[in-house]
Curated annotation (Swiss-Prot):
Keyword hit for Zinc: no
Gene that specifies this protein: dadA
Enzyme Commission (EC) number: 1.4.99.-
Membrane topology: Peripheral membrane protein
Catalytic activity: a D-alpha-amino acid + A + H2O = a 2-oxocarboxylate + AH2 + NH4(+)
UniProt-recorded name of the protein: D-amino acid dehydrogenase
Chief subcellular location: membrane
Amino acid sequence: MRVVILGSGVVGVTSAWYLSQAGHDVTVIDRESGPAQETSAANAGQISPGYAAPWAAPGVPLKAIKWMFQRHAPLAVRLDGTPFQLKWMWQMLRNCDTRHYMENKGRMVRLAEYSRDCLKTLRAATGIEYEGRQGGTLQLFRTAQQYENATRDIAVLEDAGVPYQLLEASRLAEVEPALAEVAHKLTGGLRLPNDETGDCQLFTQRLARMAEQAGVTFRFNTPVEKLLYENDQIYGVKCADEIIKADAYVMAFGSYSTAMLKGIVDIPVYPLKGYSLTIPIVEPDGAPVSTILDETYKIAITRFDKRIRVGGMAEIVGFNTDLLQPRRETLEMVVRDLFPRGGHIEQATFWTGLRPMTPDGTPVVGRTRYKNLWLNTGHGTLGWTMACGSGQLLSDILLGRTPAIPYDDLSVARYRSDFTPTRPQRLHSAHN
């Protein structure tokens, strides 16, 4: 089968890999000059299934009001003048109750855990290297309330069979020795020992080369104008004066998927702007061993071989990609506060990217009402965490194979009022 994949970020490239390994003739189309040039270029570097959680959570609406007046707020909203933004925010607010939060987090963890296992299998099969580490993730709490609130997420982890450690402040240095100097600022942490880290861009670029060697065609510097459709199927992709045809089409354009699908399929994917700093390491002993997540500022600090990646924050501001100095100051403040000796901050590279976010935090993966159009988009801040699982899942669905995990509640159909998902199995049963 001939398959066209739109998008060469980590989600598009992993989709191409799994589909080509299944025997399909795959072509990837992207406007950029190479893979992983936009959202996948400089993300936080975390592969953290247990921390997969929607931004739409109980208490977020009130917190958002308080954050409006805080210099280092993790979330900011500026109206972009579109009705779509208002509708998306309303849908997000409707997911901010406990029932929706637990439901959304449960399916996100299910896919993320599966994806981490798919990555392990891929790594063993190919030997791909991407400055990866398997040292776990440590979520840091600065208040007693944050420490107490961790019990809510622990319930989901236990149901998913995800191992964890709830640590008091005095024990944080056991897993991250550099935190010994700042333990007095913290109340404790939640550690997930099975989480991983790695350079998403490096992984995507190297996997793209492997995919190309396996027969995948990459069409870079090729802007897509529109999808061509008739009745219940897509019959081509218009790129300038060329129409590229295939038997099946996969939408993996991230934040740009919504506009490309306008008039074809309605998906609630909106850009969530984030920032990162990439800092050269000065004192290895003063840098993190693996990756930490600051719960107060929603910022991750991740160790690569010779660099520290600091990433986070969320701005609901449309497609604005301006680099704002106050956001850099927030990233610098957090890394200086926790790892003051770790890196040469003055030499840091400042970056911003647009994460494709759904109102419920769960990506949109699966079929559409068009019999040859498939979706793999809307992964938000978890594209790196969920990419391999989403690619394998999509390949299985397209081939008519039964996937290893329940998947019907990942499709765009879940936004229909009459949608009733099948009851998921316990998550650990899918990847033991």
